[in-house]
């Protein structure tokens, strides 16, 4: 982790430990990346994103390489963190189940906004159905 050089080594370590604790990995602090599972590596990435207390976290397929159980855990952790830290999350995903947990879903087709859903105005099941229809329409999945 990189910090401004005006921050002491002790303070940097304290922030790193705190971030790892927040994602449940303080006990794995001295492990190498190849000694961590995919879910643990994603949680380390989340911890790194929290170090400077950002107002926005950008996540590109944060659960893309994870099994469904690990994906759920990572998404619950992200939701908890953004709520606790008053942070916003902008996420790219192809997983409709994850997309329907958002407050807002923006569908892109060929790099252009196709639809913009606010989930407080529309039920999550309706959004899931619309996303399934879109996937069928653009050929990502069989109809």
Indicate residue ranges for each PLM-predicted region:
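Conserved catalytic motifs of ABC-family nucleotide-binding domains
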Residues: 53
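Helix N-cap at the start of a conserved alpha-helix in ABC-type nucleotide-binding domains
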Residues: 68-70
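Conserved ABC ATPase signature
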Residues: 32-36, 40-42
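Hydrophobic anchor residue at the start of the ABC signature
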Residues: 46
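Catalytic Walker B motif of ABC-type/P-loop ATPase nucleotide-binding domains
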Residues: 57-60
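ABC-type ATPase nucleotide-binding domains, specifically the catalytic core motifs of the NBD
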Residues: 1-11, 22
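Conserved beta-strand-loop-alpha-helix hinge in the C-terminal portion
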Residues: 112-137
């Amino acid at each position: 982790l990189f910090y401004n050089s005006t921050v002491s080594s002790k303070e940097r370590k304290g922030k790193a430990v705190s971030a790892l604790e927040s994602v449940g990995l303080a006990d794995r602090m001295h492990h190498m990346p190849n000694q961590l599972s995919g879910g643990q590596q994603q949680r380390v990435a989340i911890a790194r994103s929290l170090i400077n207390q950002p107002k926005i976290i950008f996540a590109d397929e944060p659960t893309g390489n994870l099994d469904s159980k690990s994906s759920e855990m990572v998404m619950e952790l992200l939701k908890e963190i953004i709520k606790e830290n008053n942070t916003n999350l902008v996420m790219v995903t192809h997983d409709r189940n994850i997309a329907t947990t958002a407050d807002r879903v923006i569908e892109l087709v060929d790099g252009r906004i196709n639809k913009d859903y606010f989930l407080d105005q529309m039920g999550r099941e309706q959004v899931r159905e619309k996303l399934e229809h879109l996937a069928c329409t653009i050929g990502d999945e069989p109809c």
